[in-house]
UniProtKB/Swiss-Prot annotation:
pH dependence: Optimum pH is 5-8.
GO terms, molecular function: cellulase activity; cellulose binding
Chief location category: secreted
EC number: 3.2.1.4
Biological processes annotated in GO: cellulose catabolic process
Species lineage: Bacteria, Bacillati, Bacillota, Bacilli, Bacillales
Thermal dependence summary for this entry: Optimum temperature is 60 degrees Celsius. Retains more than 90% activity after 24 hours at 50 degrees Celsius.
Function according to Swiss-Prot or TrEMBL: Active on carboxymethyl cellulose and carboxymethyl cellulose-RBB but not avicel, xanthan gum, carboxymethyl-curdulan-RBB or carboxymethyl-xylan-RBB.
Residues annotated as catalytic: D101 (nucleophile), H419, D457, E466
GO annotations of cellular component type: extracellular region
Alphabetically ordered keywords of this record: Carbohydrate metabolism, Cellulose degradation, Glycosidase, Hydrolase, Polysaccharide degradation, Secreted
Region (Disordered): 413-433
Enzymatic reactions: Endohydrolysis of (1->4)-beta-D-glucosidic linkages in cellulose, lichenin and cereal beta-D-glucans
This protein's name: Endoglucanase A
Length: 659
């Protein structure tokens, strides 16, 4: 056994050494290329690509739904969507929220997972070098675990959780969503080929990248991938005909043939079985004969990705030529029907396809260019495609006319107001309140500028300033490639992410409504503005402390003081309780136990009470000036630490009187 273990260690050491030598060789080759292209050493490594990669992956952690593990690194994220699937009798918790909303749309989620897995398939060594391989696998596994849950039968898959219309009508953190979250499925009676085949691709690609570290899990993924692909192939139908709720958000514009090609390719790569390659090639024949070259890979259309993989696998000219037409259109342009056609370029050099997520499309095209450049033997094409991908990536990181990063939490003047409900952290169902985000959504790539390089960091702009799992997928791969090219000597940030400083989450604002020698009336509002993470509570209370020295001096006791309410939104009031008998300090407890106070709406996040402490009529023994909780109060509402707040009996805000 010892001999075997020693051999295994030596074998792994040799493999690691070989990988390092190969990475060094690639770097030297690519540095030669970049110098030929006129790119200086300073420009080549003008960013810490390992840091960008580290942050880009953290974005997926921020998108997690379900019960979060102990390893959760974001103190502003908590468990959410724990009842997902309950309406249909299945556990559909987990997965990723799609974008700045909280719907779990199956098609873009599966696409994002598949592309992320593809980035590991291509650039595993770069992730290893950055010491981020375990992390990217963990992020992908969060999605593939969910797909396994959602695949409840060979021909049954839950393609969506959450109603897009209801979800988009509310603005607040995922942890306190108020709406019902229905689940929608596809099956043999109402199929959805796009989602089934795309998920099969994600699971098949996942099986490849997990095989080295967890063979049993990889085998499980592959089993489900085969079943889902068989389901997609046998029972064909447009998924939005069955999951109609997805139509306004993720309609299948390109149809399902591209997903059948894509899924077949990944199953072939995972199994090496010609059957799947033949199925993919057969599906190619069903694709429109006039292959488009003016678009790029997206959640809706994976043909542009598939043709690159098929070019590598089959070496057929039709796939090679189609791939190069597409990449030429995005780079230098190509002559079609006697005229040069080329993607629109902004004055600052962004390859600009569409306003809605302009950077997402440029990142996707860049990833395809990187992958193809790695394979093509023609040095001029290799240089051209790789140069394009590098420039597009650098544009996103800050090499643009605005000199700003489009990655949240990275670089110069990065976005501060992405269209993202949970990161914003509103407690009042308003995207304008608070005026600034409470949380940093590290690593998120925003939609991006218009065709004139103009961009406004506006939370309300979901076209240019939203984020999404598909936006970051290929972008993450591009950064991994940049690590491979230029990341030598770079390292990830230590102790990242930093723990956010927690603001006052629970507190009381109060004002004096009346005060004389017989009574004091106070208006108090108890707030739940929790955000680390946001959470509803039914066990909140606060205490109002008084000093009864003058009452006892006149021969009265705490039992002579009444505590009553003129206006009350659900609290119970206690008679005065002793706090420090020697100092004659007592308190009234205003207890909202059983009343839900939640940071999910203007009225829902706060509760008001107007209470009075009264001495016997005509006694004239009352003097509030020495009362602890009265200190600093005026006729205007203000936050006060002298009215402490408790949750389930534990102090969560304010200070107690000295004893």
């Amino acid at each position: 056994m010892l001999i075997f273990e020693t051999y295994l260690i030596l074998f792994k050491t040799v493999q690691i050494t070989k990988r390092r030598i190969e990475r060094r060789r690639l770097r030297l080759l690519n540095q030669c290329f970049t110098k030929k292209e006129g790119v200086s050493n300073r420009e080549m490594a003008s960013y810490n690509y390992v840091e960008v990669l580290q942050k880009s992956m953290l974005f997926y952690e921020a998108q997690r739904s379900g019960r979060l593990p102990e390893s959760n690194r974001l103190n502003w994220r908590g468990d959410s969507g724990l009842k997902d699937g309950k309406d249909v009798g299945h556990d559909l918790t987990g997965g990723w929220y799609d974008a700045g909303d909280h719907v779990k749309f199956g098609l873009p989620m599966a696409y994002s997972a598949a592309v992320l897995a593809w980035t590991v398939y291509e650039y595993r060594e770069a992730y290893e070098e950055a010491e981020l391989l375990d992390e990217i696998l963990d992020q992908i596994k969060w999605a593939t675990d969910y797909f396994l849950k959602a695949h409840t039968g060979p021909n049954e898959f839950w393609a969506q959780v959450g109603d897009g219309n209801a979800d988009h009508a509310w603005w607040g953190p995922a942890e306190v969503m108020p709406m019902n979250r229905p689940a929608f499925k596809i099956d043999e009676h109402c199929p959805g080929t796009e989602v089934a085949a795309q998920t099969a691709a994600a699971l098949a690609a996942g099986s490849i990248i997990f095989k080295e570290t967890d063979a049993s899990y990889a085998a499980k993924l592959l089993t489900h991938a085969k079943q889902l692909y068989a389901f997609a192939d046998r029972y064909r139908g447009k998924y939005t005909d069955c999951v109609t709720n997805a139509q306004p958000f993720y309609n299948s514009w390109s149809g399902y043939v591209d997903e059948l090609i894509w899924g077949g390719i990944w199953l072939y790569l995972a199994t090496n079985e010609e059957t799947y390659l033949n199925k993919a090639l057969k599906a190619v024949e069903e694709w429109p004969q006039d292959w488009d070259y003016t678009f790029t890979m997206s959640w809706d259309n994976t043909f542009f990705a598939s043709q690159i993989l098929l070019a590598r696998i089959t070496k057929e000219n039709r796939f090679i030529e189609s791939t190069e037409r597409n990449l030429d259109y995005w780079t230098t342009g190509l002559v079609q029907n006697g005229k040069v056609e080329r993607i629109t370029y902004t004055p600052g050099g962004l390859a600009w396809l569409d306003q809605w997520g302009s950077l997402r499309y440029a990142a996707n095209a860049a990833f395809l260019a990187f992958v193809y450049a790695d394979w093509v033997s023609d040095q001029e094409k290799k240089n051209r495609y790789q140069s394009f991908a590098i420039k597009q990536t650098h544009y996103m990181l800050g090499d643009n006319p605005l000199n700003r990063s489009y990655v949240v939490g990275f670089g110069q003047n990065s976005p501060k107001h992405p269209h993202h409900r949970t990161a914003h952290g509103s407690w009042s169902n308003q995207l304008t309140n608070p005026p600034s985000h409470r949380h940093t959504l590290y690593g998120a790539l925003v939609g991006g500028p218009n065709a004139q390089d103009q961009y406004d960091d506006d939370i309300s702009d979901y076209i240019s300033n939203e984020v999404a799992t598909d936006y970051n997928a290929a972008f993450t791969g591009n950064i991994a490639k940049m690590v491979q090219l230029f990341g030598e000597g770079q390292s990830k940030l230590p102790n990242f992410p930093p723990k956010e400083q927690v603001e006052d989450e629970f507190f009381v604002e109060a004002a004096v409504m009346h005060n004389d020698t017989t009574s004091t009336q106070v208006k108090a509002v108890l707030y739940n503005r929790s955000g680390w993470p946001a959470r509803s509570s039914q066990t909140l209370s606060f205490r109002y402390y008084v000093n009864l020295s003058e009452v006892f001096a006149k021969g009265f006791t705490e039992k002579d003081i009444q505590v009553t309410a003129a206006y009350n939104e659900g609290a119970s009031l206690s008679p005065l309780k002793v706090y420090d008998a020697s100092s004659r300090v007592y308190f009234a407890e205003i207890d909202f136990t059983g009343v839900v106070i939640s940071p999910r709406g203007e009225s829902e996040h706060k509760k008001e009470i107007q209470f009075r402490l009264s001495a016997p009529n005509g006694s004239n023994i009352w003097d509030a000036s020495n009362d602890y909780s009265y200190q600093g109060l005026t006729s205007n509402m203000q936050k006060t630490t002298k009215i402490p707040v408790f949750e389930d009996g534990v102090l969560v805000f304010g200070t107690l009187p000295d004893k």
